[in-house]
Swiss-Prot record:
One Gene Ontology biological process: toluene catabolic process
Protein's name in the database: 4-hydroxy-2-oxovalerate aldolase
Reactions that this protein is recorded to catalyse: (S)-4-hydroxy-2-oxopentanoate = acetaldehyde + pyruvate
Residues given in the record as substrate binding sites: 17-18, 171, 200, 291
Amino acid sequence: MTFNPGKKLYISDVTLRDGSHAIRHQYSIQNVQDIARALDKARVDSIEVTHGDGLQGSSFNYGFGAHSDLEWIEAAADVIQHARVTVLLVPGIGTVHDLKAAYDAGARSVRVATHCTEADVSRQHIEYARELGMDTVGFLMMSHMIPAEQLAAQGKLMETYGAQCIYMADSGGAMNMNDIRDRMRAFKAVLNPQTQTGMHAHHNLSLGVANSIIAVEEGCDRIDASLAGMGAGAGNAPLEVFIAAAERLGWNHGTDLYTLMDAADDIVRPLQDRPVRVDRETLGLGYAGVYSSFLRHAEVAAAKYGLKTLDILVELGRRRMVGGQEDMIVDVALDLLAARKEQQA
């Protein structure tokens, strides 16, 4: 395909959803409005707002939010004039009833997210989103875990259900530029020309921006990113960094770089109780291909049982645990503890 550098990129901010993982889902209403207002001023195309694990993610398994999804959505919608309010919905966590409530609260776009091999569970939610008239996205998580052609086939399923855009989500921050190129080409080979594609990167191997650039060069229409990289693990592709790189490449992104830079440093970074960066633990996520939002849960388990967070994460990767299996983190920690005691006996 021919790359068109003048094509308007759709910039999708995830600070208020994926970024929620970084502070254990404790955004205040004021935080949400400050961030949403700045993003809207910078003219991003969409602002995703929910618990980090999507609609109804607030739970014992994933962590309780400081507010309900609807409170966060309404708070953002009250101050946004340009961008679409977007929500994440994981079938099995959120329901179509939750989606209708989110729509009534102001959401106009939804990403229906499944594990990369489970697109078939998204049908009901995608079809209902289209009935509501929402911009509807199929979102394939942990996309590094299956080959490109298999991933594309899962995306095609979501397209047949009515998804208008198909995303590859590098939830473990484990992919490199060749992985992205292969998967984006596979998408383009099977999806209808009018179906858009999207890239959701994590920065665990410091490749979030590079991978997003490669995706665009392969025809990707939508790019996820977050202010100061605020997100699970080492964070997402930092929005202000991606936009600066896109600007230097002469791409049409439609946003104001300096407004994003100010928001990242003045509003978002001070909220981080644990720096969102590549370090021993977050690098372990990318190296082992582990779901990025496992990080904070693994840190709690490590502190409780006197283990290294990295050891827990690597074992989770070895067992090929995926999003939704947060309850297994304690099981893994107990197994590691038992193995250590056995060695010491």
